[in-house]
Amino acid sequence: MQIFVKTLTGKTITLEVESSDTIDNVKAKIQDKEGIPPDQQRLIFAGKQLEDGRTLADYNIQKESTLHLVLRLRGGMQIFVKTLTGKTITLEVESSDTIDNVKAKIQDKEGIPPDQQRLIFAGKQLEDGRTLADYNIQKESTLHLVLRLRGGMQIFVKTLTGKTITLEVESSDTIDNVKAKIQDKEGIPPDQQRLIFAGKQLEDGRTLADYNIQKESTLHLVLRLRGGMQIFVKTLTGKTITLEVESSDTIDNVKAKIQDKEGIPPDQQRLIFAGKQLEDGRTLADYNIQKESTLHLVLRLRGGF
């Protein structure tokens, strides 16, 4: 029967094979056609790397199936894995290695079972079935290893009503995960939750470890009420604009709402409250701006200073 082999360059090779051919046989045929030594070939089908001793039939590869050929570079590449204790492990890998493979190599070196490993790169937790290439992990990249402790740890979440919720979490849980756990316990949709720790609002994609939230830490849950609150903005002409906002809105957000209503670009707006000019990155809560507060809008003239 005929099968196709597609290379990373997009070239497609046609091979005459039989179901009983082993992967070794197929690699030998590719060598005959393309001159690529078998030890530099990795063949992938249906997302799985094919093992030399197995047959095409073993993998249910039928006529006109397409295999993908990835080149195994001689010597592969080195990457580093940094643990929370600060220790750095060096691994020999290839771009086509899966995250499972990498965890197995870490187990070989350090004795840590894969199911207790979480690998992070560029702020993202890496999924087992994906490859290093999928995450654009290149030579000498550094991954971060977070241990998934059996049983994790407990943290507390205190609501504005004074109620305290206990959650079972792990350091590597993201804020999204924590909000999902709160939803499971309390029925509050994640998009209505804002979590605060050490005076900072926590961002969804970050982990508890990123914020140094440890066992028995207490987070504060503020509800993002639909409709929030009203504030007023008074212009120099004496006109008053009413805005729907939330305490956690930033000054940038408020300027964008003013632009929507009045057409004034944010870079021409200066907002004043209690004699202070308000800074873009700060929130209304930072300035203790509450419902029905009045801000003053001064226009920053083009060409001004």
UniProtKB/Swiss-Prot annotation:
GO biological process assignments: modification-dependent protein catabolic process; protein ubiquitination
Gene Ontology molecular function: mRNA binding; protein tag activity; ubiquitin protein ligase binding
Propeptide residues according to the Swiss-Prot or TrEMBL record: 305
Segments crossing the lipid bilayer: none
Domain named Ubiquitin-like: residues: 1-76, 77-152, 153-228, 229-304
Gene3D superfamilies: Phosphatidylinositol 3-kinase Catalytic Subunit, Chain A, domain 1
PROSITE patterns tied to this protein: UBIQUITIN_1, UBIQUITIN_2
InterPro entries referenced in this protein's UniProt entry, alphabetically: Ubiquitin-like_dom (IPR000626), Ubiquitin-like_domsf (IPR029071), Ubiquitin_CS (IPR019954), Ubiquitin_dom (IPR019956), Ubiquitin_ubiquitin-like (IPR050158)
Keywords in alphabetical order: Cytoplasm, Isopeptide bond, Nucleus, Repeat, Ubl conjugation
Glycyl lysine isopeptide (Gly-Lys) (interchain with K-? in acceptor proteins), cross-linked positions: G76
Cross-link (Glycyl lysine isopeptide (Lys-Gly) (interchain with G-Cter in ubiquitin)): K48
UniProt-listed Pfam families: ubiquitin
GO cellular component, one term: nucleus
Subcellular compartments: Cytoplasm; Nucleus
Other facts noted in the record for this chain: For the sake of clarity sequence features are annotated only for the first chain, and are not repeated for each of the following chains.
Primary role: Ubiquitin exists either covalently attached to another protein, or free (unanchored). When covalently bound, it is conjugated to target proteins via an isopeptide bond either as a monomer (monoubiquitin), a polymer linked via different Lys residues of the ubiquitin (polyubiquitin chains) or a linear polymer linked via the initiator Met of the ubiquitin (linear polyubiquitin chains). Polyubiquitin chains, when attached to a target protein, have different functions depending on the Lys residue of the ubiquitin that is linked: Lys-48-linked is involved in protein degradation via the proteasome.
Family under the similarity heading: Belongs to the ubiquitin family.
Protein name: Polyubiquitin
Source species: Glycine max
Gene: SUBI-1
